[in-house]
Amino acid sequence: MRILPNISRATWFVGIFFVVNILLTACNQPSANSSAEPSPTETNSPVAQVTTDPYKDYKPRLNGKATVEMMVNGQPIIIEVDGENAPITAGNFVDLVEQGFYNGLTFHRVVDGFVAQGGDPKGDGTGGYVDKNTQRPRNIPLEIKVDPAVENAPETPVYSRALGNQAGFPVMLPHKTGAVAMARSQMPDSASSQFYFTLSDETGFLDGDYAVFGYVTQGMDVVLKIKQGDKIQSAKVITGQNNLEK
């Protein structure tokens, strides 16, 4: 699962549609036809069609916020995980942290000034979490919370649907320096364990297509020094454990 090929930063803005489509590359599932640009019927009011929460009983989920301490190169990175606006995405991450899943995994992809991506047990961008009890992969739905200021914005997140930045709908958890989000394949509901830190404010074109679930609150200097191959020495939940519902 890769969110960006080896292209220079200068090429990111050679057409947003082109770039976002490059971001959607296959992981451990076959590719599917997908476009980050909404169709004419979707552009008018894609969020108005959401009336119920199809994932209200999904677990694990984070009901509120939690704080995670991640150690990289001997230094701490503190992440505030937001289950208020991304309960399923945040719950998945916190659950994996509690299991010790990320300990020892590498950052297999780092693009200076853009993202540092890790969380793949295979270390090559093709892996994800497999439940130890069921021996089945866990994939979570794409989860985007639209800003309530938007007309007809639903109270719950929009699931399984890439809205795309081009739709013009501001999101509650935007991409900016220090955002933490899930990587995925071309399939909207393919995120598993791979996540990325954004290294620049010039990443807003990912809003609506990738699910941000938290932000770095301390240790951004550590994040900016991450190199490809660096390991997550440890990750632990230091506050908000009781907000995780399994």
From Swiss-Prot:
- Extent of Polar residues compositional bias: 31-52
Q: Which GO terms describe its molecular function?
A: peptidyl-prolyl cis-trans isomerase activity
Please, one GO biological process term? protein folding
Keyword tags: Isomerase, Rotamase, Signal
What this protein catalyses is: [protein]-peptidylproline (omega=180) = [protein]-peptidylproline (omega=0)
Which first-to-last residue range defines the signal peptide? 1-36
Gene3D superfamilies membership:
Cyclophilin-like
GO CC annotations?
outer membrane-bounded periplasmic space
Q: Which domain of life is it from?
A: Bacteria
EC number(s) for this protein? Answer: 5.2.1.8
Ranges for the region named Disordered are: 31-55
Give start and end of each PPIase cyclophilin-type domain: 64-246
- Per its database record, what is this protein's job? PPIases accelerate the folding of proteins. It catalyzes the cis-trans isomerization of proline imidic peptide bonds in oligopeptides.
User: What family is this protein classified in?
Assistant: Belongs to the cyclophilin-type PPIase family.
Q: What is this protein called?
A: Probable peptidyl-prolyl cis-trans isomerase sll0227
Please name the source species.
Synechocystis sp. (strain ATCC 27184 / PCC 6803 / Kazusa)
